[in-house]
């Protein structure tokens, strides 16, 4: 009554419906805070058909599951959800088959109003399932077919291009590239960025210096060993992920090669292990907490009915120059 609004308008304002102006929503929410009003979530779910929960399914078999970034990412998702008046529902799956089964169960039981999908895939069964079910979702990564897709992504392709230019300015001409898992959208984009950097620097890409599908420390060690044992090995290696770059350190140590002097290495992610490596790893750092907040915010807007084409954002990784890159001494 104090706001001179109908009960229906107040309800729609509290639930973030797009037909209610932002100014009205803000007035209603401020009054609700002053009156210490908290809607009963169960009753609200019955009335609106919404759970006010965002879903996130963690694939335990994935190489990211134990990585430090996950804690920051989940903290961001949780903070972003809470800021929008939502909770975060986290489920887990131990295989790709179980992953889709888990999504089907969550959909059937209406456990969430929408889903955050980490690590977008080139052919993504999660996207196909949620599209067909007409359930809102947001991707951490991009899709070639954007229909119905909201996303937030870091422009890894720009980072790879910048990495090549950095190495070129240091005099490197034989630059290797160890890409990530080709099932993921990021690998295609980062590969394109590497090639764009080589073209910009006026250098041809040597296919013998390209490796694909490396995502772990061991993958990086194995790929780098192949490159470094060539008759004409690279003087620098760009890696699509930091874990792989740290694997390059191991391969170099195996062969008695000094990182930063005889071989330059650039990574991508900004994990703490890279900062503590000897020498510290030159990389492109990603703020995973901020990404989590952004994804949750976009998903709530999508749930509220905002068109998906208005909910696609990208940001840049931050270049962190450290001791793993230096002038080429093999001119």
Task: Show which residues each predicted segment covers.
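Flexible loop/turn connectors
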Residues: 225-331
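Amphipathic helical "hinge" segments at domain boundaries
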Residues: 26, 35-102, 199
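Short, well-structured alpha-helical segments in soluble
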Residues: 99-111, 221-232
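Periplasmic-binding protein-like
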Residues: 112-118, 176-178, 210, 231-241, ...
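Flexible loop/hinge segments that line or gate small-molecule binding clefts
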Residues: 118-162, 203, 243, 269-281
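N-terminal helix-turn-helix DNA-binding module of bacterial transcription factors
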Residues: 1-52
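Hinge/beta->alpha junction and helix N-cap segments in small-molecule ligand-binding domains
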Residues: 60-72, 90-99, 152-162, 178-223, ...
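Short beta-strand segments enriched in small/hydrophobic residues
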Residues: 9, 48-63, 166, 174-181
